[in-house]
Structure formats: structure tokens, C-alpha cells
Swiss-Prot record:
GO cellular component: ribonucleoprotein complex; ribosome
Pfam families assigned: Ribosomal_L39 (PF00832)
Species, as recorded: Thermococcus onnurineus (strain NA1)
Any single biological process term in GO: translation
Family as reported in the entry's similarity comment: Belongs to the eukaryotic ribosomal protein eL39 family.
Protein name: Large ribosomal subunit protein eL39
Superkingdom classification of source: Archaea
Molecular function in Gene Ontology: structural constituent of ribosome
UniProt-listed Gene3D superfamilies: Ribosomal protein L39e
Listed InterPro entries: Ribosomal_eL39, Ribosomal_eL39_dom_sf
Gene: rpl39e
Amino acid sequence: MARNKPLAKKLRLAKAAKQNRRVPVWVIVKTNRKVMTHPKRRMWRRTKLKE
């Protein structure tokens, strides 16, 4: 990817990086392990973003 990115693309990539986190431990504890995963997790090799 280019070193010089448009700001809008950079912000989109940053938002996607922030969303790509595991479910917090306190949520897992609070829901008694019913919620362990979330469907928006993305593997950088398998699923690409629309840019």
C-alpha cells in the first residue's frame, strides 16, 4: 500500500483496526461465556476491506 494515503482512507483503516478486537473479558464474564466471539472479527489475509 502507498505510503502517502488520503486522509479519508487512513481514517477508515484506523476505524477497521479498532473494530477488529476481541470481545472484552468483562463481557465474557458478565454473560457467563454465552458471548465469546463477535461476527465482525476480520483476518487480514482472508477478508479484505472495501477501499
